Amino acid sequence: MVKAKGRAKEFQDPDEPITKDYDPEADVDVSEHGSGSEDSEDENAGTEHYVSVGKSKLRKSEGLSLGPQYRGSRVSRDALEEESASEEDDEEGSGDEEFDDPETADLERDAAEANDSEISSDNALGESDEERFKDYTFRASSKPNKPLSKRAKAADYMSSSDNEGAELGGSDSEDEEMDDGLDALVDGEGDSDDESDENDDEEGSGDDEEDDEDDSESDEEDSKAKAQNAKPMMAALSTQPDVDKGLAIRQQRKAYDGLLNMRIRLQKALIAANTFEALDSNPEPESEPYEAAEEAAIKLLNTISSLKDNFGPSHAGEKRKRELDVSMTTSQIWEQMQAEEERAIKSREDRLEKWSRKVQSVNVTGPKGLEGRNKTLISALRDQLINPDNRLAKRSRVPRSCAPAQAAKGVSEDNNIYDDADFYQVLLKELVDQRTVEGSSGAGAGDAVPTVVLTASKDVKNRKNVDRKASKGRKMRFTVHEKMQNFMAPEDRRAWEQGAIDRFFGTLFGRKMQLNEDESDDDMDVDVEEAGLRLFRN
């Protein structure tokens, strides 16, 4: 047994015999046949021949061995009773209070001291102290009639008109009452009657304050709900200009695609017009193809003229122009076309100037000099057309793809043709690039104007060399050797036969090579069984 230490040693009786604990239930034999024996027999039915192995070490519940320092010490009952008695005496001694002599005790003073912690500032002065402290003023000795009003919020001004009027009137009355209360506190004119009235008002106004708080909370919730509903509207309003710009750009793109479609379809007509110069100048006027072409040309000129009138400015009160007819001479047709061009040139220049100013950047750095900085688009176009040494104008008179007849004859320059192959190739290249980008991204394909069937090369998708049958790419990949390059199978181009080759190698160095054919014949004559028995004859 471990020796007692510390305080336990003081209560230890050296003469006390160590008694052994006795458990009355320890010697009771557990009956195998008791209540529930029938159930146990049913459970063990068919398994009587099994060997009982008992519980495993993992299933045995063993207590934790905390060590000898956690074991208790034996204490006698007398020592335990003495300790409890001493503790009760200490509690009784601490609970005793010192009382004064009842004959000399001042009960009123003792009651005042007992209630000193609960006295309020309003009842601090008694009736006997009024004369002594009548000239003194105690500030903030009473509670205000109503709490200070909260700071105004945006929700306070979002209520209905009736509530606004009531709230404004109530705030004025509250301000007046606050001013009166402050004046009374400063001057010291408030009396106990006013304070009692204020206390009564406070009790009566408690419900009103709760109602006001509920109203303010509901107003705040309404304002929050309105603010949340206004957020998507504000976001939609802020993004609306961007949406309008996007729609306008889409419409411009459609118009540009339509004009490019017209230019592509007019390519054959331009080639035919440039080919007229190379044909016979005196065709048969009575031929049927000539008349059909003339009617088609007059119809096309009328269509172009009507389009110019529709897009041009309206001229009210003017006489309706005469349509072109086959019976008109070439000079009359040319004069009418010149008149239409003069009427449309002013409107066309105004529109070009307007849109050039809109699309022009603010920080454009023009050429040096004031004239170059102030040059407009119209003046620049006129200079390009009037200048005879202009490179673009000269290039338009060189026959290429748009004038195949002159190009076949080797003509270097012809003033009667118009060939814009350079500009046309640039337009086609931009169209192919645009269709390629739209096809790869998958956007805008439905909005594009159908022009011509173009086979644009799509970007080849580089896919990784992944074995789909492997388990998450964990299949081992290896290369045995490099692929053979520039490999060709050998081809026998020799003129000698195999027998001649053997004879040549056999007669080299002046002697005949023995092929040991005789020895092979002798070996063939030996019996296989006889050769196998030689091992046992030795």
UniProtKB/Swiss-Prot annotation:
It is found in: Nucleus, Nucleolus. Residues 7-23 have a biased composition (Basic and acidic residues). The keyword Zinc does not apply. Its main location: nucleus. One of its GO terms (cellular component) is nucleolus. GO terms for biological process: maturation of SSU-rRNA from tricistronic rRNA transcript (SSU-rRNA, 5.8S rRNA, LSU-rRNA). Residues 80-105, 172-222 have a biased composition (Acidic residues). Keywords: Coiled coil, Nucleus. InterPro entries: AATF, AATF/Bfr2, AATF_C. Residues 290-363 form a coiled coil. Residues 1-239 are annotated as: Disordered. Pfam families: AATF-Che1 (PF13339), TRAUB (PF08164). Belongs to the AATF family. This is Protein BFR2. It comes from Gibberella zeae (strain ATCC MYA-4620 / CBS 123657 / FGSC 9075 / NRRL 31084 / PH-1) (Wheat head blight fungus). The gene is BFR2.
